[in-house]
Amino acid sequence: MSFDIAKYPTLALVDSTQELRLLPKESLPKLSDELRRYLLDSVSRSSGHFASGLGTVELTVALHYVYNTPFDQLIWDVGHQAYPHKILTGRRDKIGTIRQKGGLHPFPWRGESEFDVLSVGHSSTSISAGIGIAVAAEKENKQRRTVCVIGDGAITAGMAFEAMNHAGDIKPDMLVILNDNEMSISENVGALNNHLAQLLSGKLYSTLREGGKKVFSGVPPIKELLKRTEEHIKGMVVPGTLFEELGFNYIGPVDGHDVLGLVTTLKNMRDLKGPQFLHIMTKKGRGYEPAEKDPITFHAVPKFDPTSGCLPKSSGGMPSYSKIFGDWLCETAAKDNKLMAVTPAMREGSGMVEFSKKYPDQYFDVAIAEQHAVTFAAGLAIGGYKPIVAIYSTFLQRAYDQVIHDVAIQKLPVLFAIDRAGIVGADGQTHQGAFDLSFLRCVPDMVVMTPSDENECRQMLFTGYHYQDGPSAVRYPRGNAVGVELEPLTKMPIGKGIVKRHGEKLAILNFGTLMPEAAKVAESMNATLVDMRFVKPLDETLILEMASRHEVLITLEENAIMGGAGSGVNEVLMANRKPIPVLNLGLPDRFIPQGTQDEARAEIGLDAAGIEAKIRTWLA
């Protein structure tokens, strides 16, 4: 979309953060209003993360107004809320390309802009990185300031508290801003708190505070008494005791939509020494009533008409794999009250909304705490229940030690329902489910299943749920199922594949939902097609049979080639002295950027045309 100067006259004056800092302070509310309207106009035309950015407009304006970015370093946690930041840092005219192939990255990205200090996508990393950045600046004697912005969801993760505990110990000069948009920590927002925040962050209070520390440093009982008195007084009116105990100077909560008040408070805090903590209260979806009322639905949106206030409805095609899982979950829970479903803040994405309403006593959303989710499930299994951990492939990476140490070593029957496996599309490098087959198949006693369609997905979930000799995993992609008939649920024989088509010289061993593409190639090349189903244990008998009957083998998977299912096939062949040529096809050894799933598969040659072209080139 072209930028309409007439609609956004103040925003038009801001082509850089230097120009922003030249504006009179009184113009910042108008700038914030225009920035919010421009964000609404842009995202509604192009799609993208929406509600979070609407809630951080004033904060973003205030931060770039007060701090000398990019010299001063601003770190956004996760990055859903960073669209206003991108608009103000030279990417305004490209914001309509966000999450598209060749367009702006969906999150802050170091390779995209010097203003993006940390590449992000997963949550709760900002404070840890910020401490390292602040320490590096101090060691280089650079007078740059470090600011981390983290949400009230992300701050619940253990990593964030580990970082704050460390900051309290080494006391770097840095500011952590808690963007609290769920009222989950405090509701004490109002004129008194805003005034108190400005008072507590002001020079007079800070001077008296530091002066008192020096005067009474040699009199420990008095120093301790003053410290406890200060904590008591602040604790009566602010909810920051926890952060104070971690070693931060806590200020807040303040109104995160009062841009002038934020500027005053940030200026006061800018030169304070040691770890500082500013708690701001915002409203997700601010300024657009439908998003304010339903921020979850408007978290990430397709193209829509903002005047209607409604998102486009589903076209009514095939159900998503997430829905297939959710329906199976409800169906199983209706027959077994021992089922316990666990998810780390992925209720909507994992298709668990209906289940959470129907079976609230069997549903646990542990927040952004993947490590805890897995070990919590281990405890449920020890207690005689049947836990299912519903988690995205990319987030399971964060709990790998728990999968091994707390589940697999003890051979606990935990079922992992791994959503968003393979190419996910618009969220790019940080969210592709590229590695789960590689890091799971090397874990002893783990059963790993890759369905080729929704019927197999249900059968595998059923099989894993009833498997009691250790952990199991079923991985399935983002997107819609293929439309096959759903059969009655039965347990599948563990580690057995099936031949779908008999051919001549070539055999394609397919793992997972690339099966429709593999079928087209098999038909075109008169190849044998095998639905391998299991990555672990592999069907070694079937692999050796295919090797004996064919001249070459092709393995196909939507996982990293290195260490993936194809590598397992190679190992079987070598162990059995079957020196047959094998071509492993899958995700290449690089991080795959944003774009649609179809665009990504076409680019890396995992659509039917690309698969056939790679095979023919290899055979030539």
Curated annotation (Swiss-Prot):
Q: Which cofactor does it need?
A: Mg(2+); thiamine diphosphate
Recorded metabolic or biological pathway in which this protein acts: Metabolic intermediate biosynthesis; 1-deoxy-D-xylulose 5-phosphate biosynthesis; 1-deoxy-D-xylulose 5-phosphate from D-glyceraldehyde 3-phosphate and pyruvate: step 1/1
Gene Ontology molecular function: any one: 1-deoxy-D-xylulose-5-phosphate synthase activity
Keyword Hydrolase in the entry? The reply is no
UniProt binding sites for thiamine diphosphate? 80, 121-123, 153-154, 181, 288, 370
- Give me the comment on cofactor binding: Binds 1 Mg(2+) ion per subunit. Binds 1 thiamine pyrophosphate per subunit.
Per the UniProt entry, the Enzyme Commission number(s) are: 2.2.1.7
Its UniProt entry gives the catalysed reaction(s) as: D-glyceraldehyde 3-phosphate + pyruvate + H(+) = 1-deoxy-D-xylulose 5-phosphate + CO2
Sorted alphabetically, the Gene Ontology cellular component annotations on this record are:
cytosol
Function according to Swiss-Prot or TrEMBL: Catalyzes the acyloin condensation reaction between C atoms 2 and 3 of pyruvate and glyceraldehyde 3-phosphate to yield 1-deoxy-D-xylulose-5-phosphate (DXP).
Q: How does it assemble?
A: Homodimer.
Q: What is this protein called?
A: 1-deoxy-D-xylulose-5-phosphate synthase
